[in-house]
Amino acid sequence: MPVNQICIAFSTKAARQEFPMSDFLQTGPAISNTFTSDKLLQSLLQRFIPAQHWQQVQTDLERPGARAAGDLLRFADDAEQNPPWHRPFSPWGERLDEIVTAPGWQSLNDASAEEGFVASGYERRYGEFSRLYQFAGIYLFHPSSAFYTCPLAMTDGAARLIECHGDEDLKTRVLPRLISRDPASF
């Protein structure tokens, strides 16, 4: 049978009944804890982070790794399905210029603050290895972030710039908000 006749045959109602799509259901990938399942990351971190910090770093990274496979993934799905949009005017013509975000996007913001994805690099909990710890957390978060890691990178860049070159007003007024773990002020 020529190829064009095969294509026509499969497009007929009889062919669709004989080969229904409901017989082919592919399950999506199951994501597990992004830290405990990434042996290479663990090996690299253990190589560079001193032994006195390693156990605590390992414990601290298991939490965001688990969240990346759970609630953060659900928040990201909502954020992806409902991208931010610009509302220029109210229904009465008043100028608003608001960016409207979905609950998932807002939850990603809150979780980012709670997990300290920016703050951990500035708290210096692990001394000179704090930035490495910070970047590992962001690495674990990124696949479940709906690219929320992009504004986090900009926030981190602004925080570092203010920390190194900002005047006292910026360091007092702005920096604490950029590196806050409190979602209400982050």
Where are these regions (language model features)?
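Extended, charge-enriched "interface" segments that sit outside catalytic cores
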Residues: 10-12, 16-127
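Glycine-rich flavin
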Residues: 105-186
